[in-house]
């Protein structure tokens, strides 16, 4: 399925590092970045953050895209954030704008919620003064508008990006990421919980040192009470990391990758006892280590992993399944070998399909003795493609067969009940669009 079905909007849909979720078989997409189209920036392959005042919806039955505008008090540019959907509400926390990293949360919600307070009493000195508000917009309404929100209790996590989130019992459970702490915060943090990568300093009155690095912290935001908390975890925690992938199965949060390991590691956090478990696997049976990939739950015991940036510096196109009961990886054959992806999204759709959207197809990073070499221009994608993870029902097979062979049934379609006819015609639109793409 190609995003070009949105009339004249194809290039505007190209993006990476966005957030996405599926509601009523409609894919919602917000944020991310793409290659700048300004003449002076095109040659250098400079990326720009996409508009924050719009959200895109794709009807997965017909393949048709629709843009909704979110007006009001629009947030500033934001990348590297973490988005999550709770009861049809999109929450966005952290990330980085043109000024630096953020520890402010933004939510899309219809009710007024409060502004998050930071744990640092001198935040204007510690971190650049940006993204200090929370915002809300009810995306289920025909007209959406950003609204500033106020007052949350508890201690807000330090600024970060490239973190992950599990949604469990209307709570947002964040893990890891890359960000900034004051030297005082670092002194009060276990050395195994924050790895300092570099330091900088600012002088406003007194000299203040800031430490930049990776963490393995767990922070919880309760959406019902608007309260932050930091549970004490037990067991062997993952090493500090970012750009990893997370997924939820029952009461357990799983994460993989994001660390510089030759094989893809996988951990589990029990969200009731807050106990970590690491899966010890034979290296010969595990996928290549990677980051910026996706991990999607497809059953009560299976996790589907796709793509990412390999430890070898190349964008990957492989698909794997991890069975949490047997504790084993299985490499999957699939029809999308021509679609390597990094910084994409992968959502669970109807019939346990994995719906992949966007991302970059050619990110390549290699290190030599002097510098880091990066692919000059990224190819940000706009297509939606689907992985089938189980046999379809007879109804789904018939629906798709009629949609893909509409000429055979052209005279009979009007005989169907109106609701069924409407659904079949959406499938006709979908397969007609596919034929146009294949013959273009």
Annotated model-derived regions:
Residues 1-12, 63-69, 148-150:
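A short helix->beta-strand "capping" segment at the edge of beta-propeller domains
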Residues 43-63, 102-120, 124-144, 187-226, ...:
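Beta-propeller blade signature
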Residues 9, 23-48, 70, 86-105, ...:
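Glycine-centered tight turns/hairpins at beta-strand boundaries that repeat
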Residues 13, 48, 76-77, 127, ...:
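Conserved loop/turn at the beginning of each blade in beta-propeller domains
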Residues 239, 278-292, 325-351:
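Conserved blade-ending motifs and adjacent loop-strand segments that build the rim/top face
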Residues 16-20, 77-83, 159-165, 217, ...:
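Beta-propeller and closely related beta-sheet repeat lectin domains
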Residues 286-324, 345, 362-363:
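Loop/turn-rich, solvent-exposed surfaces of beta-rich toroidal or solenoidal domains
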């Amino acid at each position: 399925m190609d995003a070009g079905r949105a009339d004249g909007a194809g290039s505007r849909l190209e993006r990476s590092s966005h957030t996405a979720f599926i509601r009523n078989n409609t894919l919602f997409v917000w944020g991310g970045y793409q290659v700048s189209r300004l003449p002076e920036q095109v040659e250098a392959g400079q990326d720009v953050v996409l508009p924050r005042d719009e959200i895109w919806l794709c009807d997965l039955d017909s393949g048709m895209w629709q843009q909704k505008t979110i007006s009001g008090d629009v947030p500033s540019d934001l990348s590297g954030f973490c988005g999550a959907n709770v009861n049809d509400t999109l929450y966005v926390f952290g990330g980085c704008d043109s000024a630096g990293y953020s520890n402010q949360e933004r939510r899309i919600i219809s009710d007024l919620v409060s502004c998050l307070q930071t744990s640092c009493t001198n935040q204007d000195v510690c971190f650049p003064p940006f993204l200090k508000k929370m915002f809300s917009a009810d995306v289920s309404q025909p007209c959406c508008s950003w609204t500033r929100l106020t007052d949350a209790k508890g201690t807000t996590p330090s600024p970060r990006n490239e973190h992950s989130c599990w949604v469990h019992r209307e709570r947002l459970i964040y893990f890891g990421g890359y960000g900034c702490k004051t030297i005082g915060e670092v002194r009060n943090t276990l050395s195994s919980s924050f790895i300092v990568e570099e330091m900088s300093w600012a002088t406003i009155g007194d000299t203040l040192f800031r430490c930049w690095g990776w963490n393995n912290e767990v922070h919880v935001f309760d959406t019902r009470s608007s309260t932050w908390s930091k549970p004490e975890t037990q067991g062997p925690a993952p090493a500090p990391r970012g750009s990893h992938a997370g997924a939820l199965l029952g009461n357990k949060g799983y994460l993989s990758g994001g660390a510089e390991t030759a094989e893809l590691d996988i951990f589990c956090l029990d969200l009731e006892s807050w106990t970590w478990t690491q899966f010890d696997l034979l290296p010969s049976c595990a996928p290549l280590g990677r980051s910026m990939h996706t991990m999607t739950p497809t059953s009560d015991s299976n996790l589907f992993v796709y793509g990412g940036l390999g430890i070898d510096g190349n964008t990957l196109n492989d698909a794997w399944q991890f069975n949490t009961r047997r504790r084993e990886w299985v490499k999957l054959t699939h029809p999308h070998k021509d679609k390597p992806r990094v910084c994409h999204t992968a959502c669970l759709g109807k019939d346990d399909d994995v719906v992949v959207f966007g991302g970059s197809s050619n990110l390549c990073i290699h290190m030599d003795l002097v510098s880091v070499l990066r692919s000059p221009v990224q190819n940000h994608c706009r297509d939606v493609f689907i992985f089938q993870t189980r046999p379809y029902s007879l109804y789904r097979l018939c629906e798709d067969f009629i949609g893909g062979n509409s000429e055979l049934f052209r005279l009979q379609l009007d005989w169907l009940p109106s609701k069924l006819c409407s659904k079949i015609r959406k499938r006709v639109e979908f397969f007609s669009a596919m034929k146009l793409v294949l013959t273009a």
